[in-house]
Amino acid sequence: MSHLFAHLARMKLIQRWPLMYNVRTENVQEHSLQVAMVAHALVIISNRKFGTTLDAHQATSLAIFHDASEILTGDLPTPVKYFNKEIEAEYKKIEAIAEQRMLDMVPDEFKEDYRSLFISDYADPTYKAIVKSADTLCAYLKCLEENRAGNTEFNTARKRLEAMLESNPNPAVKYFMDCFVPSFTLNLDEINKML
């Protein structure tokens, strides 16, 4: 018997941004879906606009599971995770243990299919970078949504993430920012007017 999917089902119970006041809370499961959709889009943009031949499904699969180990660790807030180099190094060890525990739940005959999805060191670096970009984009979108709802709690995070995205070397990220992100500052009536 494997407890893998019983654990994965608990992704919806792990709240993100735990130290911040949220107008609307976000859980790891819904965040992972959004990251998967954005990672898929980044690959499509990259292939169609910038001549790459990447596999959108590989990026999507990696994105779905990118935070799965948080079922075991919880979502440690960024200021805590990166407080200093010692804490960051120790947390990476904790993450590695949690990733291995996730893989250990997979039946032996499927372990190789899941290894690169659960163990970040086994993930293809190209797709890992795409998922990291998508993850950053989604965190930025969360900040925009909170700001639009009048919550200034996310201002500092928004500025930090915006700077990260502006310095991102992937041209698909800039394209996504220019094409899709502005809509996140609009309300539903404004979005519907544009249809």
UniProtKB/Swiss-Prot annotation:
Major localization class: cytoplasm
Ligand binding (substrate): R16, W17, H31, D67, D75, L76, P77, T78, D135
A Pfam entry, by short name: YfbR-like
GO molecular function, one term: 5'-deoxynucleotidase activity
Cofactor: a divalent metal cation
Catalytic activity: a 2'-deoxyribonucleoside 5'-phosphate + H2O = a 2'-deoxyribonucleoside + phosphate
Gene Ontology cellular component terms for the protein in this record: cytoplasm
Domain HD: 28-140
SUPFAM superfamilies in the cross-refs: HD-domain/PDEase-like
InterPro entries the record matches: HD_domain (IPR006674), YfbR (IPR022971), YfbR/HDDC2 (IPR039356)
Locations listed in the record: Cytoplasm
Site location (Appears to be important in orienting the phosphate for catalysis): R16
Keyword annotations: Cytoplasm, Hydrolase, Metal-binding, Nucleotide-binding
EC number(s) from the headed UniProt entry: 3.1.3.89
Function text: Catalyzes the strictly specific dephosphorylation of 2'-deoxyribonucleoside 5'-monophosphates.
Quaternary organization: Homodimer.
NCBIfam families membership: PRK03826.1
Family, per entry: Belongs to the 5DNU family.
Protein name: 5'-deoxynucleotidase SO_2484
Lineage: Bacteria, Pseudomonadati, Pseudomonadota, Gammaproteobacteria, Alteromonadales
